[in-house]
Amino acid sequence: MTSRMAILSGLLFWLLLEWNPAFAYSPRTPDRVSETDIQRLLHGVMEQLGIARPRVEYPAHQAMNLVGPQSIEGGAHEGLQHLGPFGNIPNIVAELTGDNIPKDFSEDQGYPDPPNPCPLGKTADDGCLENAPDTAEFSREFQLDQHLFDPEHDYPGLGKWNKKLLYEKMKGGQRRKRRSVNPYLQGKRLDNVVAKKSVPHFSEEEKEPE
């Protein structure tokens, strides 16, 4: 215990000598030890002595004192991390699984038909739906025929679905007629209804005779 106190006293004296401008003053140079390095060294010694304290979390209003580019990393799904004040708590990488997706997901257990539309850079060889129309009608028909993988239920019509059948079903339906005339702009205009912050316009009928 006496040796620990002697080491701690020596470190404190050395730190005071470095930080006190009355003892020595020299401009900051690249070779000079930074305050962060000193704090890290002191924390490591205190941790070995068994008297380390958790690191101090500064308030949010002191964030403006930071210099240089800053970045925030972390989260539950960014790989292995070490949590806790001393970084000694390893995290567990969670699996992205849902209620309808088995946790032992392998290559022979994929999403049933219909496959999802192909993202950028993918083709039909990757098991996705290529050249899918970007329309509400196609999306509605697609969702009606879509099923998730559920080992507890059996879909008898699962193997009957195919892309050609969906396209034929869409082409056979009635298409929505496109209107070139807005019916809400027809008829006599109401002159007493004006837009906000606009100059009111009165018709010739409402003008008083001079």
UniProtKB/Swiss-Prot annotation:
Residues 1-24 form the signal peptide. Its main location: secreted. Pfam families: Secretogranin_V. Proteolytically cleaved in the Golgi by a furin-like convertase to generate bioactive peptides. Sulfated on tyrosine residues. GO terms for biological process: intracellular protein transport; neuropeptide signaling pathway; peptide hormone processing; regulation of hormone secretion. Interacts with PCSK2/PC2 early in the secretory pathway. Dissociation occurs at later stages. Acts as a molecular chaperone for PCSK2/PC2, preventing its premature activation in the regulated secretory pathway. Binds to inactive PCSK2 in the endoplasmic reticulum and facilitates its transport from there to later compartments of the secretory pathway where it is proteolytically matured and activated. Also required for cleavage of PCSK2 but does not appear to be involved in its folding. Plays a role in regulating pituitary hormone secretion. The C-terminal peptide inhibits PCSK2 in vitro. This is Neuroendocrine protein 7B2. The lineage of its organism: Eukaryota, Metazoa, Chordata, Craniata, Vertebrata. The gene is Scg5.
